[in-house]
């Protein structure tokens, strides 16, 4: 039998090598799952399948994992390195496979008991052939296939094949916690079976809905029936017209997911990413897979940089063994032919505004709740639109409000919000963003626009997807809003806790996105060049500054989740110079090499700098304070930072709590001393004039933010009775003038939303009394602090502009 089995395996290898291309999840199981290669590994497969076993062997060889067909030799005992949990329907099946598996587990457990240094790792492995969940009116497509069935299946699903390595189970841990349990081997097998069942569901998801049946159910819901009746009361309306309008709205909104479309999309997108980018880097996907296995309802909330985000995240999730979500897409993307295609890939469409339209808002809310009820993962962009500046935008809370309301209605599964950072070394629409910021009208999406974008397709560097720390909503609400389960409502019938909870969760999502940013060659090199007033440095200066930033990010991490490039500073610079349309130019003269950023590309580069600006504003602020004083105490530095930090925190969604700032500033100071940028003499921090150029470059990261704050504070001192709206308008006018006169490239410098955030933070920080009047003394104190950190030229321009504004207002 053994010889026949070996011949059978050899015969199988030929069609496998020709027809099957397997993707490993995760791509690096040794590091991502923390496998210990110096300890024995036992692979557990769910069903007897020689095909799956050979696929496992091939992938183990590629991933530097032990060969499953080579036995483990432990203490002179040779045991199989793989086991099957169940027989299945097979030609070459192991008689009594289940009892054989338990026997192998018993023998491994005995070996572990006899050697305290031994820690055998049991690794569940499953091979997926196709991921279709099936339709509600049909049979599940993903079946447990027999040997000959799989040979046929190779032709159809050979390129849609995944192998999933799961977290290892430590037999040492099992013995420590259940050492005297005689049924431990049976328990281990039973737990593994349950794991595989959950894993299959997490990979395929619930059955796809029958669209018309879903519509019929929703149209009979009490909330929608009430909204239809309300609509029918309007002039020139009737119950029949209102119902037809409701059906039309549902058809406009609802997705129409088809698995064959998702498979086609996978092939198209694989081609697209290979053509567009040199690689897509994914981090922290395991935390999401864990939540899916635990049965959580997943709501993906990414930042929004590009229309590519819709496609990229679904593609990444599919390749991470997760179900692509239903995606809330703007109605502007519902144009032919893209609309029907996106709809078949999971997009459901939302109007930009539907305030006052009760019928539409009710139908949309009920549709979203139905998606949650059926167990579909959902994705929406909380910023509401694509960021034109590269910064996170203030969250639009409508979708989050509907999510929390759906949870309160009594979902059986817990909901977890998954913040996602998406970044690119080149955003396709960045040129368009620059034009829009200069006043051009936004071009409406259409097929012609898509074709023009496709023409630009070429190597655009790297893409980045980092999954931030999830927010389990049930746990979060229990901790911070324990009244959320109570049926208390306000005068509008909304839960009293809802608005505060929605605001808090939304801001927490933004903080978690920024906690998981990806530093890359382009945003780092761009940040250094933009720090120089002339946007140019010698190659040596630039390399030195990049290395300084990298040391700072490693030794004083913003969070443990921020990902850093692994290349040297030299390699990063060469990479950016060679990127198409990066604007970074290398020139040589008699004295050496100069790296400069051309003028036209400066505004575009600020977009990429803004992706990571929050990482270096506190080091920049510390550098600015030390440069201003030249010799300064630690307490004065911390006191100054504490005064300014609330404004930075509100604008950049920074995670440090007030009590955590001091420790972080002390770590920054210690790092600056270690890098010899400053000296610590008799408890005073002193600038090191030999490294002053590097310290000046560090200080520039916060320069434009302080200039904006100075504008608003100066206006408040001159006009303490000014309204908040007028303060924002006048601040913006002066910022525009400052931008022109001083060549400030940052597109967000005169963004109205940032001045609005600043004035709101002034109110939160007690710069106005209960009547709303300005507390001038507090404003003056902060203005004096900030004035010392910006140049005299900027001060003069601001004061001159204020005089001009006053003259205009008096006319």
Swiss-Prot record:
A molecular-function term among this protein's GO annotations: glycerol-3-phosphate O-acyltransferase activity
GO CC aspect terms: plasma membrane
Alphabetical list of NCBIfam families matching this protein: plsB (TIGR03703), PRK04974.1 (NF003441)
Residue interval(s) of motif HXXXXD motif: 303-308
Major localization class: membrane
Protein name from the UniProt record: Glycerol-3-phosphate acyltransferase
Family stated for the protein in its record: Belongs to the GPAT/DAPAT family.
Species this protein is from: Glaesserella parasuis serovar 5 (strain SH0165)
Membrane topology: Peripheral membrane protein
Compartment(s) where it occurs, according to its Swiss-Prot or TrEMBL record: Cell inner membrane
Pfam families assigned to the protein according to its UniProt record, in alphabetical order: Acyltransferase (PF01553), GPAT_C (PF19277)
Any one GO BP annotation for this protein: CDP-diacylglycerol biosynthetic process
Domain of life: Bacteria
Catalytic activity: sn-glycerol 3-phosphate + an acyl-CoA = a 1-acyl-sn-glycero-3-phosphate + CoA
Domain notes for this protein: The HXXXXD motif is essential for acyltransferase activity and may constitute the binding site for the phosphate moiety of the glycerol-3-phosphate.
Pathway field: Phospholipid metabolism; CDP-diacylglycerol biosynthesis; CDP-diacylglycerol from sn-glycerol 3-phosphate: step 1/3
Keywords: Acyltransferase, Cell inner membrane, Cell membrane, Lipid biosynthesis, Lipid metabolism, Membrane, Phospholipid biosynthesis, Phospholipid metabolism, Transferase
Entry EC number(s): 2.3.1.15
InterPro entries: GPAT/DHAPAT, GPAT/DHAPAT_C, GPAT/DHAPAT_LPLAT, GPAT_PlsB, Plipid/glycerol_acylTrfase
